[in-house]
Amino acid sequence: YCETCCSPGKRPDPKLAQVYDLPPDLRLPEKTVSQCRWSAYNSELLLHRLLTEEPPATSTATGPAAANHPHSSLRTLDPAKADFFFVPLFPACYLFDCWVKAGWKKTERCNVDESYIQPAMRHIREAYPHWNASGGADHLLVHPMDYVDGYYTEETRAAMNSSTYLVTVGDVRPAPYGSYFRSYRDIVIPSSTHLINSYHVNPRDFVDASGFPLPEPSGAADPKRRLAEAALPYPEIFEPSPTDVGLTTRIGRFFRDLFERRSTPERSMLAIFRGGWGEATDGEAYSLGIRSLFFPSDGDPTTPPFSTAQHHGFASLPDFDIALWSENDDYARRLASTKFGLGPPGYTLDTTRLYEYLAFGVVPVFIGTGPTAGQVLPFERDVDWHGMSISIPRDRAHQVPSILRSITADEYERKRKKVWEEGRRVVLEGREGNVWKLIARQLCRMKRLGVAAGPEIANN
């Protein structure tokens, strides 16, 4: 059974039953849920939609393709056929709404334990037999924030932690860094990103079917159009956005395609990074001090980038595109024209930039992060992270430019092609729902091995 479903290329057998229809008083208001689209933690909502909603109407997923979508292939309404049970609990969304109302005071909890999580977990235990039958071991809860379930009281955590967690931060370093990650119990999933999952910027409007940059973004890459389609629940990364197919458009496509066949633009920029440097009081707790190398420093540790060393920073290099931020469409254009994406840590080892890089065909560069640094990446048994990324240890972070320039064209192309053909499967999207298929494979392995958290395992 599980030897088949866990074999490469085989369709996983486990079904995920969304049998829990929480009563209205235990559901988050629709206004809160819609607001959480703008949260970096909304992977919990995206995973739920992939199971419970039909593929997007704009998708070409019909026939066999639709049958392979998680909504059809990995969900059953019959609990007797279910191997695992998905709990529609969204505490990250609850806290995001709480922090918005509190002016981003992230120590606020807005009674998330007593008002939301504990009543919902009590209902699941008392209204359904499935939790008690397994001690919760065959139940799935999503915890997409940096410190997993560390935001909640011990009583709340005890009510949840016999289940399998789907987490975005996998860290096997000694405490305190890896305190909340359970190596043999949790499954690491991708984070959502603002660029793709909030603003619905479509990479295929900036790169062609092979992952090479378009001479100009397609007409559908219009931010006004995306705002008009803001109600769509899913981003698109595999097909270009639909455009008007009138005569003028068809003629334009003909000449554009003719031009693209003559000359495919190359990625002209070597490396890209968008992000900040933390606070002066953070020291090396933020980014292990690595990001201070990216920006010019006057040697004053009290001013950004908070370094005691004087240097011009990678931002001064002509083939490094380093900045605090960019407008979304400008950032998308730059991603499409860049070879490598820098991935230093922040407060944790993971970075949402990774999934933007993969979606745009940019080769990720783990700097002080990645498996060699103690980071657990999503679906390591099924995804060849080594073959589509570069890993640079922290003590060689200052050598990033020379290391990247030493990579041969052939090696870069191998990694770029693997990113495009394999890496995009790890990005949260709605057309294919590959993330759920990868989750199912890992659940299959856990079931085969008899791994079950049980009430005796706690997050300490």
Question: How would you describe each model-predicted region?
Answer:
Residues 229, 235, 240, 264, ...:
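Donor nucleotide-activated moiety binding/catalytic core segment of transferases
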Residues 1-140, 144-145, 428-460:
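N-terminal pre-catalytic "stem/leader" segment of glycosyltransferase-like enzymes
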Residues 11, 77-83, 133-136, 262-266, ...:
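Extracellular/periplasmic catalytic domains that process cell-envelope and extracellular macromolecules
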Residues 330-427:
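Catalytic binding pocket for nucleotide-activated donors in carbohydrate/polymer assembly enzymes
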Residues 70-74, 126-129, 205-207, 254-259, ...:
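Eukaryotic intrinsically disordered and solvent-exposed regulatory patches
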Residues 110-265:
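Catalytic core of nucleotide-activated saccharide and alditol-phosphate transferases
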Residues 3, 28, 93-98, 133, ...:
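Short catalytic/ligand-binding loop motif for oxyanion handling, primarily in non-cytosolic enzymes
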Residues 24-25, 90-94, 145-149, 172-173, ...:
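Short, solvent-exposed loop/turn segments at secondary-structure junctions
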